[in-house]
């Protein structure tokens, strides 16, 4: 009996202690601890609820805390009128030397009423990289966690480089990222261009934060919330557990050679600050240092790397490469994840003409643009498209790091660009063989059918950099 009483007192004390550590970010009758960081939409506090109303002719408006926070656990409830997009900034800052619409930058907890996409709880890099660091594309349970037309409970845990989010008790993200260590928290009402959205609202309540003794309050991660690791040259404990390894060690030529050499090229490639760069030359295939390939061959695998293109650049990641093919001029032969500046390289918008032979004459049948040479595409075979959103493929910008991911498993192949799936196919299928028959690869017998092959980084005569090249065999 005494033991039960002691346990009850301990649990009661623990509960009281826990509640006392939390700090409410909503005062009873004012917003004195908040300030407008950007925009001109109105935020109102009434009965413990902060509400913001959407208006035309203003950039996104942010109501931010005056205090900056580094490590914390943040909880809140939120209601978003259908049709609106919103978010909660954290570890964010303001830059007053840029146009107002991009003044606030930093991590954003996405609030998304688009049920076809369902990325609420995802992490967007607002006005900095301007893309999702963690889109909800590999977590179906997380994608369905947010419910339109009701209050939703949200939680953010930001400790060191680890950022995790939950909605209604369902884990949405598991991100490792070093971009921001400290900043304000801000509530967003997104800018609108559609008059039908005028007057719609976003509402928050029960906003509270915990900043001390965080370890004992952190939640266990769920296996369904795939980890995304943006830390340079580091394999996380989770990645090591799942048999990831670096395909390039970041410092030496070990494990790589020239595609048409027995050693690594003596020129044309440089290694600096854990970055592997192919240097610019004449814009032609393999005329400088030449392509490089792995010493090993791979069959079923998941490959991930970060790449950065210079303006107008062209390159590629090839897999199932047979270096005994094409011993002459040009690149080695294999399936290719195209890397290219879609906007500034003409090969991404290469024109074609289809001729039809009839009654002894060749007649023009169709003019068009070969869209299967754009970034992320299976070069000259399948165009990369945005398969996770009802919108066009998100762009790749010169001089910014982007992520390529290739999955190969028993003939099934996927290309991912910045954690968004852009194509999938079966390399042993009838459809694939038909595509090859009408491509530049038709002259290579059984193209793409190898059981295993090398992985290749292409020298196309343009400056392109690579880092964090990692792989796991499936």
Enumerate the language-model features and the residues they cover:
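Bacterial Sec-dependent N-terminal signal peptides
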Residues: 1-20
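Carbohydrate-interacting regions of secretory-pathway proteins
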Residues: 19-474
